[in-house]
Amino acid sequence: MYTINGLGVAIATPFDDALDIDYKAFERLLDFLVGRDFEASAGEYAQSAFADESVRESFQRFWVRESGGVQFVVVLGSTGEGATVESMERRELVRKAVGRKLGIPVVVGTGSNSTKVAVRLTEEAVDLGADAVLVVVPYYNKPTPVGLVAHYRAVAAAAGGKPVIVYNVPGRTGLNLVPSVLKQLWEIENIAAVKESSGI
């Protein structure tokens, strides 16, 4: 099992003009983030995006110099449209990320304001090969501290021993995790980390 540490990137989910997921662009972005096929990927993108040859060459040099080197990727987080993509699309994105054999952990966003849905998404992600899951604090419903702990216990059990990263982003959820709740969550064996985005 991978250890989740170092620099991670929440990967964007690219869409085409028809609002369908661009899976090829997603795979190129994954390769870029781990430093794989820089020049080939940069050249392919530059060829289609820039008509001027000097601009293409500058872009390609920048791409190769600035890319790669992350220690884990997060698929289907907030940036990855985790709350908005369809179930089939979620599964395909996880399959693509895991199937890319990046050599680094793939963390999958599986949070929901429904415990039942969060459990199902977590089970699916783990079954598809996710190395860890990122679970946002349930949004909109504003559960009590007891409800929050119960929610995370259920999700952690569904993760089958894989690390669970708690995601505290009160600006999006309307609920801030307080230290007393975090202390209880930390007692759950596979709660491994907190992504803290409260701004405090």
Listing of model-derived features with the role each one plays in the protein:
Residues M1-N176:
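Active-site beta->alpha loop and helix N-cap motifs at the rims of alpha/beta catalytic domains
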Residues A156-K162, V169-I200:
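Catalytic alpha/beta core domains of metabolic enzymes, predominantly
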